[in-house]
């Protein structure tokens, strides 16, 4: 028995590995991952190849009800304004006309100021603060435009005379002389224009008289010829 144990100890025990144990349990995982990745790549390519559909913006339909209400409100406002004007007295209508005229004048003044490159008219003419020569020209042009709106008034000439006197009081004698010369030049030009106008009117009247005189001359010649014939007949008798 002891010999058997010695023999068993001396002999090498060879353990054969199990074939199943040699199989890598992770084997095939890489293949599955490769297949999965290739499948995902194909799906991504298909998604990229698909044409993207752009959604058309939803068309906003006009609110017909709102438009109808606004139109109705506008018509009512016009009717109320017409009734208000119809119930006005003559004095109230005149005041309303002057008010609208003032609004129009302010609008025209604003356009004139914008023409000169001025946008601020909060204070009207008082907003001007001219410093340079160009600014004084703009101020003078605007002021002249404003005053000229009342040129049809019978009080306008006297107003201008008083205004010029009031303004010239602050001038020196040298500057006042310049103003006087400018006014005299303007007066001379006005006289020439009036003479030309009167001359043209006179020429037009003379042309009309010449035509009338020619017709009368024909009648006079006929009458003279008739008188001569009568005289010759009397002499013959």
From Swiss-Prot:
It is found in: Cytoplasm. GO terms for molecular function: translation initiation factor activity. Residues 63-115 form a coiled coil. One of its GO terms (cellular component) is eukaryotic translation initiation factor 3 complex. The keyword Cytoplasm applies. Residues 47-58 have a biased composition (Basic and acidic residues). The keyword Transmembrane does not apply. Keywords: Coiled coil, Cytoplasm, Initiation factor, Protein biosynthesis. Residues 20-64 are annotated as: Disordered. Residues 28-46 have a biased composition (Acidic residues). Its main location: cytoplasm. InterPro entries: eIF3-like_dom_sf (IPR023194), eIF3j (IPR013906). GO terms for biological process: formation of cytoplasmic translation initiation complex; regulation of translational initiation. PANTHER family: EUKARYOTIC TRANSLATION INITIATION FACTOR 3 SUBUNIT J. Component of the eukaryotic translation initiation factor 3 (eIF-3) complex. The eIF-3 complex interacts with pix. Component of the eukaryotic translation initiation factor 3 (eIF-3) complex, which is involved in protein synthesis of a specialized repertoire of mRNAs and, together with other initiation factors, stimulates binding of mRNA and methionyl-tRNAi to the 40S ribosome. The eIF-3 complex specifically targets and initiates translation of a subset of mRNAs involved in cell proliferation. Belongs to the eIF-3 subunit J family. This is Eukaryotic translation initiation factor 3 subunit J.
């Amino acid at each position: 028995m002891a010999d058997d144990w010695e023999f068993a100890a001396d002999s090498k025990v060879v353990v054969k590995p199990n074939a199943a144990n040699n199989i890598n349990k992770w084997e095939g995982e890489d293949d599955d991952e490769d297949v999965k990745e290739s499948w995902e790549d194909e799906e991504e390519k298909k998604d990229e190849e698909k044409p993207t559909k752009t959604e058309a913006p939803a068309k906003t339909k006009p609110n017909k009800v709102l438009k109808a209400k606004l139109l109705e409100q506008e018509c009512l406002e016009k009717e109320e304004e017409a009734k208000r004007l119809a119930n006005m007295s003559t004095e109230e209508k005149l005041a309303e006309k002057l008010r609208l005229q003032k609004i129009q004048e302010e609008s025209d003044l604003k356009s004139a100021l914008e023409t000169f490159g001025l946008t601020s008219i909060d204070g009207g003419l008082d907003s001007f603060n001219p410093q340079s020569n160009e600014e004084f020209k703009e101020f003078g042009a605007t002021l002249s435009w404003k005053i000229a709106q009342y040129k049809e008034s019978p009080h306008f000439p006297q107003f201008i005379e008083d205004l010029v006197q009031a303004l010239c009081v602050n001038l020196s004698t040298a500057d006042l002389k310049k103003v006087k010369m400018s006014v005299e030049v303007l007066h001379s030009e006005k006289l020439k224009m009036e003479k030309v106008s009167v001359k043209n009117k006179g020429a037009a009247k003379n042309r009309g008289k010449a035509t009338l005189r020619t017709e009368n001359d024909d009648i006079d010649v006929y009458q003279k010829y008739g008188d001569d014939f009568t005289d010759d007949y009397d002499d013959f008798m």
